[in-house]
């Protein structure tokens, strides 16, 4: 059995996987609550095969329950969401990772990404960045593309690459996934550098720079943990990005 922040999952006696999530009604948006199901239609993305689901409303509390059944992973989850040491990942793994993220961005959807179950909008991006980096005036996102929106090391497998837990996916600013994974890697500098290298086109775009500040704001903002080992690296990168945006 695997327990995560919002769900619990376990292997079944027919060699499939069932993931059960409990979500408050006020956290279910107008687009519904079928991320894993709708992600099954994505082309070119390595993910477990979706089999079916059951959804029900709690009789006693204002919450919904959802159980999704999928195929098994071609490996094990790489680790916790934020890693403290470098994982052993092959070059084949990194190629599959890059191919899947490229393919994901080529798909189309009407869904909107909900990182941390919060719908991402232009206003959210602007408020998040300016709340920590007020010197950044223009926070306009130019390109919105499909994103996993919870891309971290607990949601990918190895040695075989697969991307799972799709409940938050939808359109988001270009670079959202790359920046999210980079932030989850900052405690291991060599890993964070590899993520930036693999997704350099995303990070080099203006939207990618804004997403770098978006994730840095979460690490450096008022609610940040003072002992977070990522603070120093996030602050250093944020200073570089802010300077770059100000000079054009």
Protein language model features and the residues they cover:
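Conserved ATP phosphate-binding architecture of protein kinases
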Residues: 5-11
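Short, well-ordered beta-strand micro-motif
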Residues: 11, 69-71, 157
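A conserved alpha-helical element in kinase catalytic cores
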Residues: 14-69, 76, 81-103
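An alpha-helical support segment within catalytic cores of ATP-dependent transferases
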Residues: 90-97, 103-149
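Conserved catalytic-loop position in the HRD/HxD motif
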Residues: 145-155, 160, 165
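Active-site Asp-x-Gly
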Residues: 158-198
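A conserved long alpha-helix in the C-terminal portion of kinase-like catalytic domains
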Residues: 182-248
């Amino acid at each position: 059995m695997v327990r995560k922040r919002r769900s619990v999952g376990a292997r079944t006696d027919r060699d499939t996987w069932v993931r059960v999530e409990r979500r408050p009604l006020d956290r279910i948006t107008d687009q519904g609550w079928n991320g894993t199901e709708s992600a099954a239609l994505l082309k070119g993305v390595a993910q477990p095969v979706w089999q079916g689901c059951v959804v029900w409303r709690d009789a006693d509390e204002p919450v919904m329950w959802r159980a999704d059944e999928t195929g098994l992973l071609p490996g094990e989850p790489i680790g916790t969401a934020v890693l403290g040491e470098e994982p052993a990942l092959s070059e084949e793994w990194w190629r599959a990772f890059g191919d899947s993220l490229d393919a994901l961005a080529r798909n189309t959807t009407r869904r909107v990404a909900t990182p941390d179950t919060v719908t991402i909008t232009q206003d959210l991006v602007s408020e998040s960045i300016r709340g920590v980096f007020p010197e950044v005036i223009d926070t306009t996102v130019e390109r919105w593309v499909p994103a996993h929106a919870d891309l971290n090391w607990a949601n990918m497998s190895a040695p075989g690459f697969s991307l799972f837990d799709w409940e938050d996916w939808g359109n988001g600013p270009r670079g959202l996934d790359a920046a999210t994974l980079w932030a989850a890697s900052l405690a291991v500098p060599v890993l964070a550098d590899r993520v930036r290298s693999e997704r350099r086109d995303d990070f080099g775009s203006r939207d990618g720079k804004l997403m770098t500040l978006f994730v840095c704001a979460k690490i450096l903002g008022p609610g940040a943990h003072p002992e977070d080992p990522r603070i120093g690296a996030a602050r250093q990168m944020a200073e570089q990005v802010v300077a770059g945006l100000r000079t054009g």
